[in-house]
């Protein structure tokens, strides 16, 4: 690869130095992957998965043994009592919406304790967007968010003060998303849950688990979360699931959410799986390994770009809890050029040049470099971000470590050619 780059010799030398630095961390990632894959394998064996479970269902989808067993496996692996895993859940945002509308009722309040959530959730809660769009606000469900401290930690005093008799759901966003703060480790989420449950044990703790599955050995429900949600075109789909989302948690809350997902009186009993089951099963089995490849790529990205003077978050040697690696460019042109170079190093649509543009759910123009086999799949290598200071690109995913390495080296070579670094 390096002999095709303009600055190949320099980049090869730098890459070799980087891989020597990160070898120990890569070993740790592989060990976590092996333990997570063992847990998945044990669950498949426990549930006696066979090729019968891949049989498509049509129409109403009643008595779909493949779908029902997969939901039991998700619950088993992720530490919940029950789960919903459906191709009809179109995204992580949709899964989160089902969770919130499933358990909140008029007069209740949702309190996010990890700061303002993703931009896409602002229209769900009703702080942005038109009236009568069906937001929580339209149903007289309150919303509040507690800002983090200056160093990105939970402000526990402010959380205690914000909890009131109307508070029913505590929202926790595991990944930083587009925010300039650290993502939260499972150990930190465990402490958050302990804290709010001591105030009121009846509070429902919901965790947005997007980008976090299989990064650590435990998931939020293992440490006391009542409900969590995510997307199948992120970590748990293993790069094979073409669409879908999931919810896992306490059985009574999953049942409540199932009525929001379909209809009261129907719940989880219907919903045809069509031809999605085989790829969902195989993708979930591969997910721990694929996530490890993405993580190894993220560590390489951080160390490589830090050596070139860029600011990365998390740092290359920091403990990780999600796939997202942010890189601060402090310059609009550099950020756009980097994302474009990632697109050019992709297997799909490498001939396409992405430009910043409006995207539904986001306040600023966003650039999205995603030459992926599955549209919008964050488990595949992508680079994106809102065009606003300090011009941070969010790099995530990678089905293979070698693709991430090749793409980052190629992107840096492109920036060098343009004399941007």
From Swiss-Prot:
Pfam families: Met_gamma_lyase (PF06838). InterPro entries: Met_g_lyase_put, PyrdxlP-dep_Trfase, PyrdxlP-dep_Trfase_major. This is Uncharacterized protein YnbB. PANTHER family: CYS OR MET METABOLISM PYRIDOXAL-PHOSPHATE-DEPENDENT ENZYME. The lineage of its organism: Bacteria, Bacillati, Bacillota, Bacilli, Bacillales.
């Amino acid at each position: 690869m390096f002999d095709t780059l303009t600055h190949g010799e320099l980049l090869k030398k730098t890459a070799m130095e980087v891989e020597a630095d990160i070898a120990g961390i890569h070993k740790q990632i592989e060990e976590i992957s092996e333990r997570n894959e063992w847990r998945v394998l044990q669950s498949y064996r426990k549930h006696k998965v066979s090729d019968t479970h891949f049989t498509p269902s049509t129409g109403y989808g009643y008595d779909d043994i493949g779908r029902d067993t997969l939901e039991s496996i998700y619950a088993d692996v992720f530490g919940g009592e029950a789960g919903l895993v459906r191709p009809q859940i179109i995204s992580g945002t949709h899964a989160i919406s089902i969770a919130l509308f499933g358990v909140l009722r008029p007069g209740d309040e949702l309190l996010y304790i990890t700061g303002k959530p993703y931009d896409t959730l602002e229209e769900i809660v009703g702080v942005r967007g038109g009236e009568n769009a069906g937001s929580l606000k339209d149903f007289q469900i309150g919303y509040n968010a507690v800002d983090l401290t200056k160093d990105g930690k939970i402000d526990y005093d402010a959380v205690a003060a914000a909890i009131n008799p109307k508070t029913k759901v505590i929202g926790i966003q595991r990944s930083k998303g587009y925010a300039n703060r650290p993502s939260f480790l499972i150990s930190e989420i465990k402490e958050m849950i302990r804290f709010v449950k001591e105030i009121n044990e009846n509070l429902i703790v919901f965790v947005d688990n997007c980008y976090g599955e299989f990064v650590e050995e435990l998931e939020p429900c293992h440490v006391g979360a009542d409900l969590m949600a995510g997307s199948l075109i992120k970590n748990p789909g293993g790069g094979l699931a073409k669409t879908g989302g999931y919810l896992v948690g306490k059985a009574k809350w999953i049942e409540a959410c199932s009525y929001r997902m379909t209809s009261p009186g129907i719940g989880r009993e219907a919903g045809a799986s069509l031809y999605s089951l085989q790829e969902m099963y195989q993708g979930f089995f591969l997910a721990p390994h694929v996530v490890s490849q993405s993580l190894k790529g993220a560590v390489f990205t951080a160390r490589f770009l830090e050596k070139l003077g860029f600011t990365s978050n998390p740092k290359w040697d920091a403990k990780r809890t999600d796939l997202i690696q942010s890189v601060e460019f402090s310059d609009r042109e550099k950020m756009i050029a980097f994302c474009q170079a990632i697109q050019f190093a992709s297997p799909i649509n490498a001939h396409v040049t992405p430009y910043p543009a409006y995207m539904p759910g986001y306040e600023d123009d966003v650039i999205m470099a995603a030459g992926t086999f599955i549209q919008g799949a964050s488990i595949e290598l992508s680079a994106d971000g809102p065009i606003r200071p300090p011009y941070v690109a969010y790099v995530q995913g990678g089905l293979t470590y070698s693709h991430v390495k090749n793409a980052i080296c190629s992107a840096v070579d492109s920036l060098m050619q343009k004399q941007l670094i």
